Amino acid sequence: MSHLNNALVEFFVIIHKFISSIITNPNYSYGVAIIFVTLIIKLILLPLNIKSMRSTIRINEIQPEIQKIQKKYKNDPQRLQQEQMKLYKEYNINPFGSCLPLLLQWPILIALYYVFNNIQGISGVSFLWVKDLASPDIVLAVLAGATQYYSGLLMNPKGDNTQAKTASNMNLSMSIMMIFISSRLKAALVIYWVTGNLIQMGQTILTKKLEQKHSANKDA
């Protein structure tokens, strides 16, 4: 983990040096550097994120079939698992595919927490309405929760069934928790989180459109 921490510190320093050569005012250069770092990290994770989103979208689409299987084999767990895996294979779905990007993002987030705690230059630096990137900002915290909520909303299954309601409640709970956590973190880290959520929303909308086009071509 220390190698990742040190690598991200060096990476951020390089990006900030490049940005500050164009934008000399530190009240803009640090914030823009954080956004650039987020874009680069998201770009690196893009193939995994798209694959993950496709799996999630397809699983949501076949929920009626999954529920039929669950109802039919509710007293036979082994057969239930076999039939579900058969269905996933038929639709080319990896049920665990959505977990990998999330598992990769947490070490990065923890490493960035280390980065912003060890880069002294951000102390006292403002960005947009944020007075100090090294201090918490309540507006950013609310934005973190709101973007987290809408990002999750785009991926949640539609309908009034139990799974849709559970996913909706979990999304709301996580978003409220995000506001609480972000209100205690340095604004620099929360800018990364908000920017990442906005990018995620764009990726989800684009991937959904591509999946709809793929389904339409398949049915034609």
Swiss-Prot record:
Its main location: membrane. One of its GO terms (molecular function) is membrane insertase activity. One of its GO terms (biological process) is protein insertion into membrane. It comes from the Bacteria. It is a multi-pass membrane protein. Keywords: Cell membrane, Chaperone, Membrane, Protein transport, Transmembrane, Transmembrane helix, Transport. InterPro entries: YidC/ALB3/OXA1/COX18, YidC/Oxa/ALB_C, YidC_ALB_C. It is found in: Cell membrane. The chain crosses the membrane at residues 4-24, 30-50, 96-116, 172-194. GO terms for cellular component: plasma membrane. Belongs to the OXA1/ALB3/YidC family. Type 1 subfamily. PANTHER family: CYTOCHROME C OXIDASE ASSEMBLY PROTEIN COX18, MITOCHONDRIAL (PTHR12428:SF65), OXA1 (PTHR12428). Interacts with the Sec translocase complex via SecD. Specifically interacts with transmembrane segments of nascent integral membrane proteins during membrane integration. Required for the insertion and/or proper folding and/or complex formation of integral membrane proteins into the membrane. Involved in integration of membrane proteins that insert both dependently and independently of the Sec translocase complex, as well as at least some lipoproteins. Aids folding of multispanning membrane proteins. This is Membrane protein insertase YidC. It comes from Clostridium tetani (strain Massachusetts / E88). The lineage of its organism: Bacteria, Bacillati, Bacillota, Clostridia, Eubacteriales. The gene is yidC.
